[in-house]
């Protein structure tokens, strides 16, 4: 293994891991020889791994952020596209769209916990904030499924036919409404979660993909993969109303909030850029590089780095937001899509 550079984010993670080993030994010494538990600060946790879903390989690449090396590759099912953490934070669920299954993985050890089958075409997935509902979008089969979550298992309550190619989901903070984009019929639909009924549908621009709701539940943003920007909808009325279009770049696709309660990123897959949107002013305020078909993103816990799936290059790309530059690329599998780590910035 090549030596870890003595500068940059890799070296920082390296020092953190060394600190974890030293403090863990010290904690063990105190517990064994002094007969009492060490203070909580002594046992600082090691950095959690980074998970990258290789959609055309049917695997998950597991990256050690201390060395920026892939140390494990987990077989899942066919076409793992997206992943989501369980409400208790004990599992991250990988949705295998073409295998009709969910793979539960320990977010710290990267060990497979279990596989749940007969979940039809789980392309996208999401838990409601009240932790009672689990929702999937069937991209291939044209329906949205709503499951009741009991803390361990999901139970199908309603299968809702939608339109062509349900793509992404968002649930409001009150757990009352699910919004879903229809990629091939160019629509945004709203579903009432308590009654599992379709509330409204409106036409959008070309090939709507990811959807992001502002924290006040008044506005929804839709990325247009077939266009050059993001549509902004007022969702406070009886149906969604288009109020603005933000020009970001060709192939606007996936959102990730910065965690500061004000900004959200969107990847522009064709333009190979990432745009920063101020969702209070609804303006594009910054731009970052996004090489080789930028797709899903996560943000490091300190808010300094974008972790990006470069879809066409088979790489995880690390972007320093301060310098607006690519600082590292790690080889992964074919067509990387979802990317996630437990040590992330807040999602609003």
What are these regions (language model features)?
Residues 13, 19-20, 41:
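Tryptophan (W) side chains
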Residues 9-10, 32:
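Low-complexity, intrinsically disordered short segments enriched for Gly/Pro and polybasic residues
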Residues 35, 41-348:
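Predominantly soluble domains enriched in secretory-pathway, periplasmic, or organellar proteins
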Residues 7-9, 27:
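Low-complexity, intrinsically disordered Ser/Thr/Pro- and acidic-rich segments
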Residues 24-40:
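Bacterial N-terminal signal peptides
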